[in-house]
Amino acid sequence: MQAACGLAQLERAQEFIDTRKRNFKLLKDRLASLSEFLEIAEATPNSDPSWFGFPVTVKESSGVKRVDLLKFLDQNRIGTRLLFAGNLIRQPYFQDVEYRVVGELTNTDRTMNQTFWLGVYPGLGQDHFDFVGDKLEEFFGLNF
């Protein structure tokens, strides 16, 4: 039964991929006004991702704590997720494990502490992304 459902979904795979790409672009365009406060992910050169989520990093210069922003979004019924694990060597599992580190891991720590993602699944559309944009502008004092 699960295999049959999976095969049926495969027939719609390209539709899902195209919709995720469209949704990523819609949300990216809608959040352009917040570039002073937020860093938005970009596809790397020569890539064509099917975005599972919309990564957002709160800039240190914004003066905002990610937790405060996430609480605000949650209070406004906007779902978010943290990225898996962040800096793995800061996880309890690594407390008694020998490992070596090359460099400072500043990007990894920044991702762990300041990044979250919003959904871009195919069931969302322009109205949803406008709502998210309006609420983020409100949070950062841009929505007058």
What are these regions (language model features)?
Residues M1-F144:
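PLP-dependent aminotransferase class I/II
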